[in-house]
């Protein structure tokens, strides 16, 4: 066990952690040269294209150090995006140390901070690795100072590398062997293992990634999940090199995978403790929590026939990612679809993109919303994320909305605009400080989640030319003035456009969407009224004027009553059309109307 090292790589998006993982695998001959592809551990196409890591991955490397000993290195590649921060915290709980990768041309960013603090909470030994030192803009000395001032860890012995060219990779491996502690654990104690991640494999069923803390996992053993007391029998045990290699057993300190004829990923919750049925351990490992969706939206297929394919696609994705939820719903305007819950906006985009790309579906997504807590006059408490479930305003006592604590790091020259963005989003400033003697400001804000889920992240990035970074966590529910904004077309409510908004925004939002619909809905033979309403009160209106056929064109001379008669006849015809005519709203009108403008 003294020759095992379990470590994670922590980095902000784009600081090069997946590339560093590639170089470490190459250096330890984990794969033959012909099998090597860039970002080998990012197994989904979408992970490679967006340059993000979504699922935590693991790989076991054998390394012969300069001292002549053979070491077994278990590398955990963790996601870097704020939506997946729980996956990060579980991966970190399975390790004893971390490599903190910082881009030496950009310096420390907000998500790096959040993940480093998680590593420190797990008592990790941290090795600072400064990447991209071959870039002209790299300034390792400045970044070392920044690491010491911002994070408060010693960076004097940082390893300087370029993951792209392979410079300094050997030094990283030597530092891992020399500085990181070996795992602690007792092979003879009752089994205690942490479930780090799980995914679905078409041949093996659910594959579970585990780190054994105490005891031994063996093939054929009966195991128990401590969160729900479900029991299973182990079919296969193995490790990733990063190819699957069956080993038959895993003992204390080791990381590997097991399969146990599970049908669904939802059965195994990330962070859960696994123990033996015959000889269970006395307590579960700390830090487990259920992950709940934060952002909700409805997804509808363009063709109604695709509904069953959409259900199958969602079920397949759910096999791999139990953190999003879905239930069927119907809409008068858009037909059959699903109400889905996600961990955040990136998670929503990734799932939607995977549905469209991997399953070839054309989809419409409604405006995202968050969970509001409504207390009715009768004292009932409802959790509501779908506008159609909102009770009548006369029955509501109070509505509470979720607030978050956001940490924003931003260069000084963009500070003013970022502050006004936060104020515009109803934010309350808690703290503003400068990092050491740099020109980077560290902001702490309390913001309503509903203002952040839309386009806050995009606006933050565009204002700061991509230099600002954001990390957030939900802090509390606060009483707020929330209204349901409905839209009527010729007096008929359109459920797909309804949304829940803050009172101060209702009128502006109503006007915006009405104006947009006016441009998008084609003209008819009769007048169309587009209205926005809160409760029973109309707060905005646009009118689409009808086409007018010139029925008097063929008249010339003659009596004026002939002219009047034709115009009267046209008027009656339009009136009849208006009473029986349905306004056909094209699908793209919904999609365009729901896009949030800056």
From Swiss-Prot:
Q: What is the lineage of its organism?
A: Bacteria, Pseudomonadati, Pseudomonadota, Alphaproteobacteria, Rickettsiales
Q: Which PROSITE patterns would you find in this protein's record?
A: G_TR_1, G_TR_2
EC id: 3.6.5.n1
Q: Does the keyword GTP-binding apply?
A: yes
Protein location: Cell membrane
Its Gene Ontology biological processes?
positive regulation of translation
Described function: Required for accurate and efficient protein synthesis under certain stress conditions. May act as a fidelity factor of the translation reaction, by catalyzing a one-codon backward translocation of tRNAs on improperly translocated ribosomes. Back-translocation proceeds from a post-translocation (POST) complex to a pre-translocation (PRE) complex, thus giving elongation factor G a second chance to translocate the tRNAs correctly. Binds to ribosomes in a GTP-dependent manner.
Give the record's membrane topology: Peripheral membrane protein
Which PANTHER family does the record associate with it?
TRANSLATION FACTOR GUF1 HOMOLOG, CHLOROPLASTIC (PTHR43512:SF4), TRANSLATION FACTOR GUF1-RELATED (PTHR43512)
Family matches, as InterPro entries? EF-4, EFG_II, EFG_III/V, EFG_V-like, EFTu-like_2, G_TR_CS, LepA_C_sf, LepA_CTD
The answer to whether keyword Metal-binding applies is no
Q: Which GO terms describe its molecular function?
A: GTP binding; GTPase activity; guanosine tetraphosphate binding; ribosome binding; translation elongation factor activity
Mind telling me which NCBIfam families this protein's record contains?
lepA (TIGR01393), small_GTP (TIGR00231)
Identify the keywords attached in UniProt to this record, alphabetized. Answer: Cell membrane, GTP-binding, Hydrolase, Membrane, Nucleotide-binding, Protein biosynthesis
Q: State the reactions this protein catalyses.
A: GTP + H2O = GDP + phosphate + H(+)
Name the chain's protein. Elongation factor 4
Q: Name all tr-type G domain ranges.
A: 2-184
Family assignment from sequence similarity = Belongs to the TRAFAC class translation factor GTPase superfamily. Classic translation factor GTPase family. LepA subfamily.
A single GO cellular-component term from the record reads: plasma membrane
The lineage's top-level taxon is Bacteria
Q: Which Pfam families match?
A: EFG_C, EFG_III, GTP_EFTU, GTP_EFTU_D2, LepA_C
Task: Provide the binding site for GTP.
Answer: 14-19, 131-134
